[in-house]
Amino acid sequence: MANTQNIQDALQKYGIDGWGAGYFGVSSRGTVEVHPFGNEEVSVDLSRILEHASERRIQTPLILRFPQILDTQLARLHSAFRNAMDEFKYAGDLRCVFPYKVNQRKEYIDALVKSGRKHAYGLEVGTKAELFAALSYELHPDALMVCNGFKDSRYIELAFSAKKMGKNIVLVIEGTDELKFIIEYAKQVGFCVDIGLRAKLYSKGSGLWEKSSGTESKFGLSSVEMMEALWLIEEAGLKSSLAMVHYHIGSQITEIKRVKNAMKEASRVYSKIYKNGFNLRYLNIGGGIGVDYDGSKTSFYASANYTLQEFANDVVYLVQEVCQSENCPPPTIVSESGRAVAAYHAVLVTDVREVEKMGGDIQEVIIDEGDHKLLRDMMNVYQQMSSKNYVEFYHDSIEYRDELFTLFGLGYLSLEARAKAEVIVNEIANKALHYHALSGVQLEEFEELAKSRTSKYLANFSIFQSIPDSWSIEQLFPVMPLTRLNERASKTGVIMDITCDSDGCLDKFVDKRDVKNSLELHVPQSDTPYHIGFFLVGAYQEALGNNHNLFGAVNELIVQVSPQGQLENIEEVKGEDVGELLRVMNYTDEGILSGFAQQLSARLKAGKITQAEVDQIMQQVKGYFSEYPYLLVKSRLEIIG
């Protein structure tokens, strides 16, 4: 019964039923399990996968990638729109594309293209490099390749070549200069690719990316620029080549009302252009389908106040309503949502290496007549504190502490005395917080004290590499321990990474009602790794991660699960080693080895080191090129000499 209650408490604390979208749950053993097909009928314990990694000496941190979640999420996306089209008897069609920038990892795109083929799923690119990579994939014959972003001549020439390859290319115009080059190039080669116009809507998105939309957006054509573009296309005799109207009101749209406003406006733009004799076929609604990171289903920036089906229903209904009122045939709807497709399929796993203790053991502190009077007074405060005087006595302890530290700074107090003071102050704070909790009164001073005293869990990863959005824009990701969920978590803590940067600390966590300043965690056991999972990290994080402190891309396991819930296949992808990271920064292996060799040679000539030691160090140095930059599971000191 206790285990069951602890599991129920864990479900409530970590909110997995809210943000898991059917892909994650907690087993009766108190472990996190994955449901790759979106239901509980098929499940695999994440600890089993980590056992596989341990047996093969695959170090944490690592990403667990589940292509079947990607496949399921793609099916959900297309089903939502198809269901809406059936319900409203929509006469147009659907074409979804994946924005390359959301996750450019080859392993991910490989799985995406394979899963997307049955949906005629396409790709969206925004740069020459992305287009170059995307063209190497053979997509479904009906799949679109939408080319956004600012373009130079080489970008445009490559797009024209793609049309010769049989690709359904649409070049979306960001400015009239781009359009003029396309028109000129089309004259030279004797054909034109499909053209799209990106509209700068008045309607805005919501959430963290609201500023990327509206009339102040850096992207899209104003109404005046739109009219100029239409005139240029008509003058060039390319009216039949204008195929798409495109807009985008930002990533992670949190409010469905904003979606509706934009849909109405964009549908009007589409209809007006169509009625002017242009051969429009596609209305590209951009991306922005929100991911409910905190499980609250609200308009909070880490959530979304609508479901995928509601989003699709509103889009289809409003496009049809506007087109009917304009006597315009309904277009093929194009969706570029990538976050909602990619986020769920990847889990970052790492292990806790250390928990920082606050203070020491009060039982080990001995205060006698030989100690400074302030130390004796402080111990007296600790011993005499009660529920009636805890506020006053706590204030006294702070005053004593400040006086003692001032004396230390002036050289009148020993380091041992300072250490005793720290232990006593720590225990006084604990005692005061205990009485404050019993009082039922909420004093701001003690609420802040409680926040400041959360434990610090040192985890073996880099925030800047693996979840950079949590640092750069304070994006929230679900975080929870992967085991021991049938035990009560006795501590609250923040998570520190192993970079030498004070910003490498995670102190904001998801909660259905608010944002938590700490996370419920267990005391790690010395003989068992304590693994923590960071969920919904499959969108943008790998693309935006940086090599701060020379921590690079982490190890990966690509996991396939059988319909019976067995581990069917696990593919290993090695993370970046030290040598690869240094080469990115323009170091060469030869240059580094030469630097070591020259210094060791000088030491050898000076008689400070033996040839055997030189040889041993050089052998050690060569091995470092293939070293994983993160902390090893068990480190063994190698003795030189």
Question: What do the PLM-derived regions correspond to, one by one?
Answer:
Residues M1-Q59, Q560, E568, G579-L581, ...:
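Conserved, well-structured core domains of diverse proteins
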Residues P99, G126, N148, E174, ...:
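Generic beta-strand/beta-sheet core signal
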Residues S27-Q104:
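Low-complexity, highly charged intrinsically disordered N-terminal segments
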Residues D314, Q320-G641:
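Charged (often Lys/Glu-rich) extended helix/loop segments that serve as interaction or gating elements
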Residues K106-Y108, A133-A134, I156, F181-I182, ...:
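Short helix/loop capping segments that flank catalytic or ligand/cofactor-binding pockets
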